[in-house]
């Protein structure tokens, strides 16, 4: 597939997602990084987003709960170019009923070349990068060209 570039603005749109056993860890990370996160637009799956707002007072665009379609809502935003980065603290040792949605979400961040951290160490590296507060160009699939090649003229 051909590729093109997309510019990620200095003010990032960040998805925050956590499995049940990882929610407290993500909430602790958000609290620690409240100041830099406050400069960006935050999205989260339902339970995580609501807890985040209660504990940090940060504005969060909350989707549905992950198992109720929230993971898919975040995936849609990624596909539409509306998410620039995802912090997803997932539990690799416990299966969840919506594992196919989780796998699809991780596939989409890879397809669309979205920055993703699945643990605190990686999230710390992302948020401490000088690029976190800068405009950045990323390479993404050229979906318009992809469609043009497959549709009759």
From Swiss-Prot:
Q: Which PROSITE patterns match?
A: METHYLGLYOXAL_SYNTH (PS01335), MGS (PS51855)
Q: Please state the Enzyme Commission number of this protein.
A: 4.2.3.3
Q: Which InterPro entries match?
A: Methylgl_synth, Methylglyoxal_synth_AS, MGS-like_dom, MGS-like_dom_sf
MF terms from GO for this chain are: methylglyoxal synthase activity
* Broadest EC class assigned to this enzyme: lyase
* One GO CC annotation: cytosol
Q: Could you mention a single GO BP entry for this protein?
A: methylglyoxal biosynthetic process
> Which residues belong to any copy of the MGS-like domain?
6-153
- Active-site residues from the entry: 71
Membership in a protein family: Belongs to the methylglyoxal synthase family.
What function is annotated for this protein? Catalyzes the formation of methylglyoxal from dihydroxyacetone phosphate.
Would you tell me the protein name for this molecule?
A: Methylglyoxal synthase
Could you tell me which species this protein originates from?
Sodalis glossinidius (strain morsitans)
User: Which gene name does the record give?
Assistant: mgsA
